[in-house]
Amino acid sequence: MKKEVGDACRLEDIVTNLYRLETVKQINYHQYVPSKADNQWSIQAELFLRRKNPKVLAALFSRELWCFSINDDPLPELNLELNNESESPQPERKGHFTPEFSKPHLPTPYAIFMKALRRMIYVNLTLSSNETIVPFGNSCIFQESYTFSTKILHFDPHLFENGDLTVAICSKDLGLSKLNAESLKHEVAVYLAPSGIRVYLPSTDLKKCYVSPPKNAQMFLKTLFVSHGINLIDVDGLKWVKLIPNANHLNGFTPTISHYLDEPKGNNFVIWPACLCFVQTASDVQTPQYTAFSRSPQLELDDCFDMIDGFIQLKLTSAYRTPGTSAGMGTVTGHNPLSTGGIFTDQFQGFNKHSANNSNNVSSTGENGKFSPEYSNDPNVTPLRDNKTSRQNFPTESYSSNGFITTPIINENITPTVDDIITETPSVKPQNDLWNEKKDVINSTSNINSKDASVGSSERKVELETAFESPAQNISIEEHEHVEFDKDLFGEDSDEDVSTRNKNEELVSVKEITDEMFDLAEDDDEADGSTSNSLKFDRPDTIESIDTDEKKTRTKRTYLDIPVDVITIEKTPTLYEDPGAPLPIETPKDRKKSIFAPLNFNPIFESNVDNKYKNGGKFSVNSNTNDEPIQFGISTSNISSSEDDDSDFSPADFNNNGPSAGKGLSYDPRDNDIPMIESSTYEPIAKDSLPELINPPSSSKDDSVASYNTIGTLMEKPVKSNLDAIWKPALSKSERADLPNQTINGVINDCNNSSNSNPTTYFENTPSLGPDTLYDNSKPRSSSANFLSTVEIDPKSEQTIQTAEQEQSESSRILPYLLRHMPLFSLPDVFLCQNPSLPPGKDFEDILEILTDQIVFNNDMFSDDRATESQFKGIKDCSVGTISDTMNQLFGNFSKLHGNEIIEEVFYLPEPSVFVKKSEDTIKIKSSSCYFTEYLNLKPNRGVKNFRALVLTTEAKNDCMSFVSQMSQTYSNHELGFCELTKLTNDDNKGLIYLKNFNQDTLLLLSAQIVSFCSTALSNIKNIPLLIFLPINKLSLTECISMILKFHVIRKEFKSKLPKADILLRLVNIDFLKNPLTPITAYTSLCMAIYNSLPPKSTKVTSLTNDLPKQIEFRTLKNASLSIHYDNYIHLAYLRSIDREWLCAAWSDTKGVESFVKTWYVGNSRTRFEQVCNDIWKITLQLASKNFGNVCLVLTRLDSVLPDDELIHWRRLSVATKDLHLAVVCVGDNTKLTLFDEDKTYPTFKNLFRTKSNPQTGISNSIDDLEIINIDEEVHGLIFSNPLQLANSQHRCAIKSGALIRFAKSEGDNFIDKFEVNLLNCPHADSSTLLKEILKQYRNLAGLNPWFGVSYGKDNFIPWHVVAVKNVMNSIVHVKSSFEKETHIID
């Protein structure tokens, strides 16, 4: 591999997801400030401009309105009228800025311009996409019309120094889906679109959350249309839901992730369209493994064999023949396709007749469901909860009803691996639809009973109707619950049925089949002619008591090949009847009945009934009662750095209390001891306090602008508020007479139909938006301008408002959630529904230190279970489709940028060397040799570490003995030190203690034995640490913390008796112990991780070598420069969670000799955060004191963001330290910029992966000319031509940007792994030189990942201390904790 890349790498073959929009010379702007501080003039003015022209570049900043134009384009004009007198507001500030703006702090006009640009793009995309794209926060959501799945679509604009106005287009999968009653779960988080604010459902039953439209619904829909391009004005049957918003998120603070699903504490609510609500499911929710769209081949094969086996057994064991039929008419079964002519035997009696029969199949279960896969102990059994995974889906049109014939599985000697479902033959005519219905009801209602036992009968009825609409699930429940539920559902006959089934079924005799057994099914035949589909259950009145009617004329029924005890119900006494009661009145068929009571309850209230019942009862609530308006907590935070937090207006902008509004600015959720202070009310704006905004002039050069203006001519009602003035301008009668009457309901319907009938495919692994993908604009449609111009509001659809105050208060309530845009960065990628917790108290720090050590230096053991963030994926091709058409209409030059246009230099970074010992000699080897240490007989260069090992377990005793023996032998063979297997008593095994349980009493007794043993050992030999091994059954954070708490009981007791002795913990996966094929390399990695965790922890297995300088530079007075030469570097990487609850930091010197990782619980407290910053700086100074000369601290902040409050503390601390120079760097491996590798020749190892169609070229035949390399360790450095804006900060830009990249392994892998590095300050040094040095040191520190046991393969090109912080934060953010003092007791 060349060390000088030169021309070997073709930069033009590196494709980006950046697109050029315009070539900018200057950006012009006007700033408008309202004359009064207590009005909503800025909001109304922006809506006025956006209604006038959807392409306007305008945005709000606090109470200010900013308007922009590019180059020589005119600025938007505000032509308003006051009392028919023309008056144009004058801008408070005029100016312009050029691409050569200051860095790293971006000017305010630039940040607001980027917001206005992104807003304009989203509005026009929404208008031109048939509403498949909806704005969401500072991003937008693409909704596939035929599924509920969505993808985040993000546009990240940036203005380069060379004048290129660019935008990075990328996508991200947050797992969002539309709010749906059928798929709604308890473990979901709900967000509002277009604001992206976190809200909560008041009830898990979505039907209870549906409410009538608010009184200002039409005004809201109009504002939504103009402000975001979302047209819901003419949507029929628009549903509204009542939601509880999160006040902290509205103020720019992410809700605590570990409590993300906790019930809301506030009583405020907001009413929102249900179609604009999106849900995100917790990552630890169990989902069915197979669905109707993805089936296991093994599952289908088992289905086929089960069907064949059941059919053969049925033919051999048929019991009786149907009267009037024959079995010898040319076939085995005769003319009757339902008869097999065999004999029934007792083996049918184990078949459970309460199986769910849906989708033309039936689940065959054993007694009490013991053979159901859901309750099977067989690990190979897969529970099928979704009936979509049926064997066959026969069209219901082929039969007169959806009933079916059930054929049980006979082979009871083999444990089933799947639901034994047998599908009917297509020619079968179902005969007993009524019994099929009853069995469906039993299983469907079982689901409801298992969800919530407190649900009333009315709620259960609603749930049951919902269950009828979707396939029912076959879920077995406990025997007692099943009996009680059948009794409530069907009366005493079901009791006898269940009790009979629960007995020993081998003693039940098979009765002779007679015509009486078909009485119940006989009644159902009459209803069969009027009901085309018995499984639709549109009317629950089909579920009635079976024995209430008299027997009708009996006829010969076609014989069914189903056991008698399965298809029939024994004769039972009728339900209780009062002889003195009047005759019941027959209920109409179309009236829904309750299935939860044996008697129908149909009260008829006469005219003289008590008024309290007539009005709905004593607890009824008048529907006309108005709720109190929502109250917002006002935040004083001006230090948020997440994209639009500062550029958006705060809820205080909607508070019209004048001077008293400032009193609400004392709330800061970062201080736990300060309560939230909310504004009492949001008074409406006086009617005459502002000028009424009239309809803008219709004359325009752009037809789209003129057609867009016609929306204002459609509202002719009197103005009730200044917000109404935007929609209802005051026009004279003569002017009204001249307005054309436009009606376009049909156009809107056509647009809606076209959007639903246009199936689209979203991004693949390598997104490419071509003609056949999501943005294909093949459907004919009107332009966005015509679409807007066709809107006509029916005046009759607007609800009459009782008072102006009520309407205005509702407008004040809903405006913040409509016009506020939360940054996507403030939403967690993943969250859990079951969060572990750490006990607060004096032992909290010790437990947190142990947890951090287990996460970082344990061979990335929790990498599979750890909830990782979703990655941004750039859009590679966007040349055809809606995006391309929209962007070409908005901008004059929409074209893709290639690598040679944004990359200044690419250089190869060689693999670092490390120190190790072989025999007694210290040698240097490549860092990738870590994977071959067991073959090279290497040992650490900094001495050996001895320890005692003891495994504590309650299971797998023999496996644990084998493990501890193998581990001890491996540790000694690699000369890492000596491992002694501890034996507490003579009766114990070496290195193993087998416990009955991990109760606290058992652990305390064990700790006493350990103290006794170590006390004797310490008196004879030097202090040797005791390492406790605890196997865990599941690689989860919850299990890890549970075992750490158990270990802490032992450690606490141990330390109280022997404070100078060391006792450590090492968690081991139980599968690692039990697997007999665990490779020796896994044991080697484990032993190296143990070595790194033994005291002193700063001493690791290896360290980086010192590179000899290639040339010596002499600094004299003549060539002296202002740049400072740094003799040593200290690296500090840290990350604070987005909810501000946790902070993790890691230190390392340039050689990896000094290393340290620590985690703090900040608790969203400003005081606590300041203390943590002081602790970090104190540790840093201790490391700096060990170095000489000028020391540079490379302060690395992850997540490509640097909040203002953090920067303030670093400046405060660095000013007081003269000998330590601070270089602030923001890094991230998940940024919006994506690079695609289309170079077929570079790097040279790509030639080894060529296919037959593309043969290998340029490979030498001599093996001596080749070098063995690890492709994962081949890293290059990259310097961008222009500095990049921070990915998650709208107002900060780097002074120099670069990246560590790892090229694709072959031609097919297009994505280039990228670790973006942005230098924010350069203390007395050249920025390019300093950035290259930092990239080089980052690459060297990345070589320590496998040696330190931090990462293998995936993140090996990222520095180890950055990977360590990221791994800790991905796990620790889901842990609950607090500062309260509590006593924690182990169960």
Swiss-Prot record:
Species lineage: Eukaryota, Fungi, Dikarya, Ascomycota, Saccharomycotina
Repressor is among the record's keywords: yes
Pfam families: Med13_C, Med13_N
Name listed for the protein in its UniProt record: Mediator of RNA polymerase II transcription subunit 13
GO molecular function: transcription coactivator activity
UniProt similarity note: Belongs to the Mediator complex subunit 13 family.
Presence of the UniProt keyword Repressor in the record: yes
Gene Ontology cellular component list: mediator complex
Keywords attached to this entry: Activator, Nucleus, Repressor, Transcription, Transcription regulation
Chain's role: Component of the SRB8-11 complex. The SRB8-11 complex is a regulatory module of the Mediator complex which is itself involved in regulation of basal and activated RNA polymerase II-dependent transcription. The SRB8-11 complex may be involved in the transcriptional repression of a subset of genes regulated by Mediator. It may inhibit the association of the Mediator complex with RNA polymerase II to form the holoenzyme complex.
Start-end of Polar residues biased regions: 354-367, 390-400
Record's subunit section: Component of the SRB8-11 complex, which itself associates with the Mediator complex.
Annotated compartments: Nucleus
GO BP: any one term: positive regulation of transcription by RNA polymerase II
UniProt region (Disordered), positions on chain: 81-102, 354-400, 620-676
Main location: nucleus
